[in-house]
Amino acid sequence: MTIRRIAATLACTLAFAAPIMAAAPALVALDSAVYVERIVPNKGRLLQPASALKRGDRVVYVVSWTRMGGQGSFTVTNPLPKKVYYQGSADGREEVSLDGGRSWGRLDALRVGDRLATPEDVTHVRWRVPANEAGRGSGQIIYSAIVR
């Protein structure tokens, strides 16, 4: 093989390898905390660690993420416990699933049979963290649910 052919082969190999390296999956560490929202006279709403829950309690989930490596965007998916129904997230960019994570969409655009989906139908919730936000290195996703 000539030097020119070796150089051309190496250049082609690097050209194809570069996008693969750039598209390496994001390495993300997640940490979750669960709080219950309490209304306290003269203090308003307080979040307390959720040690005991009862029907009707508003639960606030805080998912903290830290970028450990990789590039690009990533997705955070959380299944909802059967004992709660979804209320919404702080940023409104979430997608929900009604079928255990097989299909996704905005709650206001999904249907169950011939009716619009309701928060009680949600089984999973996910957020797509775009590359520009992921590049900051860390962040939080906050959403709430009501205990059934």
Describe the role of every protein-language-model region:
Residues 2-3, 7, 22-148:
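Exported/extracytosolic protein signature
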Residues 9-19:
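Bacterial N-terminal signal peptides
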